[in-house]
Amino acid sequence: GLDIWVDKEITTADSAEIDFKYYGGSDKYTILVCLNDKNKYRAELNGSPVEINERSAGIIEITLGGDVKGGKLCVCVKE
């Protein structure tokens, strides 16, 4: 929660673009994104693919290393 600051967020039912900064000191942290449960998703951080875990339909879990101090996270429908 309080270790991540969202500078900008653009969301639709099927996608999310999130500009964020991480201020914590943990070795890793997790971001959850909730989108339409009818689709399968992929994610990119600063244009590079990142691994996701779909906790349940539409709930996208992205775990990043603590050395990732921010960037642009994009989650969109897998093509």
Residue ranges and their predicted role:
Residues 21-39:
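Surface-exposed beta-strand/loop patches in extracellular or lumenal glycoproteins
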